[in-house]
A protein has these predicted regions:
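Long, non-catalytic protein-protein interaction scaffolds
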Residues: 1-202
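Structured, charged N-terminal subsegments at the starts of enzyme catalytic cores
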Residues: 179-299
């Protein structure tokens, strides 16, 4: 086993997983700023605000950029499904999760501001009843794949979820996006298509305004996604400037060059394709049933 692989394997042996509040905080900021706007645009701007501001990092020996949370091995406490109670947080702390005192205090402050403002604050209770009563789904709900894990059917999961990724909340269905479309055309093709649709839109139909909001939202999200990749390019270049080891400096500069290209442009080689795929996957998550699809075919 190569030394790099051995070190990365050892880094996976962690006993505690940090709970992060950055995404919760940024979501709250965005929802306050966009109050009264169409929901399609609110969600798009929320997504962009998170991608533009969430903490990013590149760890030692990384060759691909992108983490699903603001801390290594972290889980972002989700904002979509209601506030987090102290009992829920204490339950997680008693298991394999940890949260800093500062973040825990901030979480409770966000709860007070966020109560009733989440995008799906009534969904947990309504879905929880049906999911908890389904014998086939009960082992899944109890597993903790959606945090916090259900202790019993009566108690359910409570109000919050904590997961990894920058999608707009956890899903309860199988999700498989068209990775090949990004690999072959890049985000550039989707942005250009959205702009063309906006240009050609004629306000003759009842849903014309909704179509405009949708295409504007597509542009907002995909342009933010490209900026997210460029943030990693900036970070890799900064780290390379401070790096004294020539081999690692070269690796960081190569990572920066790749992030300048993908996901905006189509991938031109396998390394770029891997990075483009991973950025795409981060945008799909969190969802307990996200899938990479036919990786063997489109790669």
């Amino acid at each position: 086993m190569r030394e790099r692989v051995r070190k990365m394997k050892e880094s996976l042996r962690v006993s505690k997983y940090p709970l992060c509040v950055e995404q919760f905080r940024l979501a709250n900021e965005s929802l306050e700023q966009t109050a009264g706007e169409p929901m399609l645009l609110r969600r798009a701007k929320l997504h962009a605000h998170v991608l533009d501001n969430i903490t990013i990092f590149i760890e030692e020996d990384d060759l691909l950029c992108g983490s699903g949370a603001s801390k290594p091995f972290g889980l972002e406490m989700q904002y979509e499904y209601g506030v987090w109670t102290k009992d829920e947080v204490e339950s997680l702390k008693s298991e394999i999760y940890t949260i800093s005192p500062e973040n825990e205090e901030e979480l409770y402050r966000l709860n007070e501001r966020f109560a009733g403002n989440s995008l799906n604050h009534n969904l947990v209770e309504t879905m929880g009843k049906s999911l908890g009563e389904d014998d086939r789904l009960w082992p899944f709900m109890k597993s903790g794949l959606v945090l916090p894990p259900w202790k019993d059917r009566k108690g359910g999961s409570g109000g919050g979820f904590a997961m990894s990724g920058y999608g707009l909340g956890p899903g309860f269905s199988l999700v498989c996006v068209d990775y090949a479309k990004i690999l072959k055309g890049g985000a550039k093709a989707i942005i250009e298509e959205a702009k063309e649709c906006l240009h050609n839109l004629r306000y003759y139909e009842a849903d014309s305004i909704e179509k405009r909001n949708y295409w504007e939202g597509v542009i907002i999200v995909f342009e933010a996604w490209v900026r997210f990749a460029n943030r990693y390019a900036d970070l890799a270049e900064k780290m390379a400037a401070d790096e004294t080891r020539e081999t690692r400096k070269k690796e960081l500069l190569e990572m920066a060059a790749i992030c300048r290209r993908v996901p905006y442009y189509p991938a031109e080689n396998f390394r770029e394709a891997l990075q483009s795929f991973w950025f795409t996957f981060l945008m799909v998550c969190p969802s307990p049933t996200s899938t990479a699809g036919r990786f063997d075919q489109y790669m």
